[in-house]
From Swiss-Prot:
HAMAP family: tRNA_modifying_YgfZ
Gene3D superfamilies, per database record: 2.40.30.160, 3.30.70.1630, Aminomethyltransferase beta-barrel domains
A Gene Ontology term for the protein's cellular component: cytoplasm
UniProt key word tRNA processing: yes
InterPro entries: GcvT/YgfZ_C, tRNA-modifying_YgfZ, YgfZ/GcvT, YgfZ/GcvT_CS, YgfZ_barrel
GO biological process: iron-sulfur cluster assembly; RNA modification; tRNA processing
Protein name: tRNA-modifying protein YgfZ
Family the entry assigns: Belongs to the tRNA-modifying YgfZ family.
SUPFAM superfamilies given in the database record: Aminomethyltransferase beta-barrel domain, Folate-binding domain
Gene for this chain: ygfZ
Biological source species: Salmonella paratyphi C (strain RKS4594)
Subcellular location: Cytoplasm
GO molecular function term, any single one: folic acid binding
Function of the molecule: Folate-binding protein involved in regulating the level of ATP-DnaA and in the modification of some tRNAs. It is probably a key factor in regulatory networks that act via tRNA modification, such as initiation of chromosomal replication.
KW Thylakoid (keyword) present: no
C-alpha cells in the first residue's frame, strides 16, 4: 500500500501556522552504507561528519572541484552508515557525482524511495507527536529513533519536526492527526525553510554557488579544520582571503507572480532598477505575502528595495534568525 500525498494549499507563515502535517515530496532521501561509508562521505562534504553523533543532524554541502555546490545535504547517521535529505530535483545529478570515486571504496550509495518523508509543524506540534511516538527529539538530542521512524528536530523559524518513516507509520500518523491537523504539500516546509534561512538548492542553481554564498558557514555546515574534501581549496580561500562577496537573503513583500528558482531580481537605484542576485526559492503565503530566498551581494543596505523583474510591487529585506558575523 503506497502513501498518498496531500493536496496543495497556500502555506502559512510560522507565526500563524496551525498544526500541519506536510508531505515532503519535493525532498528525497539517500543512503551510504558499508565499512568505508564515514571515510568516503567525509571526503566529499563540507561538514565534519566524523564529529557528528547519532543524536545530531548536520547541513553540509557537496561541492565540485571549484567549490561550487551540487547540493546541500541534511545528514544524519544510520545503523550502518549515513542518510541525507536533499531537494528531489538535484538528487540524480548529485548521486552521480558522489558515486564517481566509489569504485575504490567499500560503500553502497543509493536513493531510498521506500521510506516516506513527512514534516510536522505549527501549533502544538510537539504535543501532537507525543501522542504517537514514545520519544521526541529536542535541542539536546536532535535525532531520535522510534521503531521504524527517525525524527529530526528543527529550531527555526519555530519548533518543527521531520520524520523519516515507513509507509505504514506514515499512513497511521495521517489517520491519527487528520482530525486536528491541516494537511499540506512541500511548499509549506519550503516556506518554513525560507523563513529559517536554510538554503534550497534546486536544479536551476546546482553548480552555481560556493557554500558561503548561501550562509552555510553560519548554519554550522562548513568545517575549516577537517581534512581534504572535494572543493575544499576554494571554500577555504573564500574564508581566509575574503573572496566571498555574496550572502543568502530573505525578502518579503508583494508580486503579481511567484518567480522561479534561477531568476534574478531588480534593486531600486534612485529612479531606476538594476538587475541583481539569483533566486533560490520563492513561495506565496495564504495572506498574499511573497517570500523570496535569494543570493545577492553581502553588503546590501538593510533598507534596500527590490522587486520581481518588471513587477509593480516591491520586496524588502527581513532579518534571518542567525548572524553572519564571524
Amino acid at each position: 500500500m503506497a502513501f498518498i500525498s496531500f493536496p496543495p494549499r497556500h502555506p502559512s507563515s510560522s507565526a500563524r501556522l496551525p498544526l500541519t502535517l506536510i508531505a515532503l515530496d519535493d525532498w528525497a532521501l539517500s543512503t551510504i552504507t558499508g565499512v568505508d561509508s564515514e571515510k568516503y562521505i567525509q571526503g566529499q562534504v563540507t561538514a565534519d561528519v566524523s564529529q557528528m553523533t547519532e543524536q545530531q543532524h548536520l547541513l553540509a554541502a557537496h561541492c565540485d572541484a571549484k567549490g561550487k555546490m551540487w547540493s546541500t545535504l541534511r545528514l544524519f547517521r544510520e545503523r550502518d552508515g549515513f542518510a541525507w535529505i536533499e531537494r528531489r530535483s538535484v538528487l540524480e545529478a548529485q548521486l552521480t557525482e558522489l558515486k564517481k570515486y566509489a569504485v575504490f571504496s567499500k560503500v553502497v550509495i543509493a536513493p531510498d524511495d521506500e521510506r516516506v518523508l513527512l514534516g510536522v509543524a505549527g501549533f502544538q506540534a510537539r504535543a501532537a507527536l507525543a501522542n504517537v511516538f514514545s520519544v521526541l527529539p529536542n535541542s539536546e538530542n536532535q535525532v531520535v529513533r522510534d521503531g521504524a521512524s527517525t525524527l529530526l528536530w528543527f529550531e527555526h523559524p519555530a519548533e518543527r519536526f521531520l520524520l523519516v518513516t515507513d509507509v505504514a507509520t506514515a499512513n497511521m500518523l495521517t489517520e491519527k492527526l487528520h482530525g486536528e491537523a491541516e494537511l499540506n504539500n512541500s511548499q509549506q516546509w519550503l516556506a518554513l525553510d525560507i523563513e529559517a534561512g536554510i538554503p534550497a538548492i534546486d536544479a536551476a542553481n546546482s553548480g552555481q554557488f560556493i557554500p558561503q554564498a548561501t550562509n552555510l558557514q553560519a548554519l554550522g555546515g562548513i568545517s575549516f579544520k577537517k581534512g581534504c574534501y572535494t572543493g575544499q581549496e576554494m571554500v577555504a580561500r573564500a574564508k581566509f582571503r575574503g573572496a566571498n562577496k555574496r550572502a543568502l537573503w530573505l525578502l518579503a513583500g508583494k508580486a503579481s507572480r511567484v518567480p522561479e528558482a534561477g531568476e534574478d531580481l531588480e534593486l531600486q537605484m534612485g529612479e531606476n532598477w538594476r538587475r541583481t542576485g539569483a533566486i533560490l526559492a520563492a513561495t506565496q503565503l495564504d495572506d498574499g505575502q511573497l517570500l523570496v530566498q535569494a543570493v545577492m551581494n553581502n553588503d546590501l543596505e538593510a533598507e534596500s528595495v527590490f522587486r520581481v523583474r518588471d513587477d509593480a510591487n516591491t520586496l524588502h529585506i527581513v532579518p534571518l534568525p542567525y548572524s553572519l558575523e564571524e
